[in-house]
Amino acid sequence: MAKIVDIKGREVLDSRGNPTVEADVLLDNGIIGSACAPSGASTGSREALELRDGDKSRYMGKGVLKAVANINGPIRDLLLGKDPVDQKALDHAMIALDATENKASLGANAILAVSLAAAKAAAQDQDLPLYAHIANLNGTPGVYSMPVPMMNIINGGEHADNNIDIQEFMIQPVGAKSFAEALRWGTEIFHHLKAVLKARGLNTAVGDEGGFAPNLASNKEALEAIAEAVANAGYTLGTDVTLALDCAASEFYKNGKYTLSEEGEYSSAEFAEYLAELTRKHPIISIEDGLDESDWDGWKVLTEKIGEKVQLVGDDLFVTNTKILKEGIDKNIANSILIKFNQIGTLTETLEAIQMAKAAGYTAIISHRSGETEDSTIADLAVGTSAGQIKTGSLCRSDRVSKYNQLLRIEEQLGSKAVYRGRAEFRG
């Protein structure tokens, strides 16, 4: 049995030029696992705490030296001599040491970086690909599937400096026969969308997640531009390719109203109908955070209205937290959960959220954050849990493409075992 002999944390940069945490876990046989914690822009109020220094003289207060010190001090002392393969024991030990509900003492960014680095070291120690080790931890050894990518090709909201309220407009190549083919379709549509926007005299600069960030007259105009790009690429909208939205509605929910910059104010029931109308006019099969995280009555209305046909995803709503997810399941709120492991802070708790969702008939979507690094762990997480869906941005920026490239490698490695289910992963 290999043992942990050293743990080292360091401050590195994420894709937005902000500091984040990287951790190395060294085993007594010389193996090193390394991992970085991502960081979000639009965040749920109940997410685990990302520990920042608050020292305005360094990185405008966004430094993470406190989190790094927690890795190099108490976390290192706690885990020295431990078995890296026993992920639950490592994660539970860190949770107990932190002893807060939201990991505010050590920082979820510190705990997560070590949790993932240990998993990577354990995978290497067993001579396993990371996705195979994750499948073992998940209790589903040897069971894999390739995820349908939800490609964010128009960015708005908190992810871009433009006038679009809805944060993400995504395409899903559900008609493809493999992940590699899905990636090609998405890339071709992405390039055709650039041409469509240019022809309209619109900006083709990209947002945090690599999608275009033009100033469009309305959210509906964004959908029309995507439809044109899909057709120009030679694909059929609704069969080859479907659409998905991330409203991030908490960002434009004020005083009990949903305020769209170009389209006015809506009550909860009115905004639920606004979204339902979009699904009637466009082949939108997934809507994330369609209502505010605190507007559970509104979520109930939306779920009853379109939940049978449309995947309704809780991100800010559930924050990868099993306690909150269980409440949602019990109340029939939404029917899907977005999985972001930095919202909860350990690999073990992330797997528990995926398992709870699947047991209740909810789908689980593995997701990046807007502040990413070259770390591609979420690709292995998606395959190793057979989650079926992944959100990792657009088709440019290496912080996004690194995940797609890792999925290509995994699909090649799995060969005939690489199942891509396409439309079967979704409701309706």
Swiss-Prot record:
Active site: E209 (proton donor), K340 (proton acceptor)
SUPFAM superfamilies the UniProt entry points to: Enolase C-terminal domain-like, Enolase N-terminal domain-like
TM annotation in the entry: none
Manner of cofactor binding, per the entry note: Binds a second Mg(2+) ion via substrate during catalysis.
Listed GO CC annotations: cell surface; extracellular region; phosphopyruvate hydratase complex
Reactions listed under catalytic activity: (2R)-2-phosphoglycerate = phosphoenolpyruvate + H2O
UniProt binding sites for Mg(2+): D246, E288, D315
Pfam families: Enolase_C, Enolase_N
Main location: cytoplasm
Gene Ontology BP terms: glycolytic process
EC number: 4.2.1.11
Family: Belongs to the enolase family.
Oligomeric form and interacting partners: Component of the RNA degradosome, a multiprotein complex involved in RNA processing and mRNA degradation.
PANTHER family listed in its UniProt record: ENOLASE (PTHR11902:SF1)
Protein name: Enolase 1
Top-level taxonomy: Bacteria, Pseudomonadati, Pseudomonadota, Gammaproteobacteria, Pseudomonadales
